[in-house]
Design a protein with these regions (language model features):
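Alpha-helical hydrophobic/aromatic positions enriched in membrane-embedded helices and signal peptides
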Residues: 24, 47-48
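Intrinsically disordered, low-complexity Ser/Thr-rich linker and spacer segments
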Residues: 1, 5, 60-65
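Structured segments of extracytoplasmic/periplasmic soluble domains
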Residues: 16-20, 42-46, 65
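Conserved hydrophobic/aromatic packing and binding residues within compact polymer-binding modules
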Residues: 39
Length: 65
């Protein structure tokens, strides 16, 4: 999932990031700049590849925290 994605799964991502203390600039189901910045911060803080894209490894880490 990357910038431009929309829908319930994006909203779930935003809710999880917010619950972990990351600012997504709202939980609206739209993967915009705020969500991308939050994903990048999460990736940096968790030793993941920093690309702003929520792939398998990023999802796995998010769901296991």
């Amino acid at each position: 999932m990357k910038k431009g994605a929309r829908g319930n799964i994006t909203k779930l991502l935003q809710e999880k990031l917010v619950s972990l203390g990351y600012n997504t600039n709202g939980v609206d189901g739209i993967f915009g700049t705020g969500t991308e910045k939050a994903v990048i911060s999460f990736q940096k803080n968790n030793g993941l590849v920093v690309d702003g894209i929520v792939g398998q490894n990023t999802w796995r880490k998010l769901l296991n925290i």
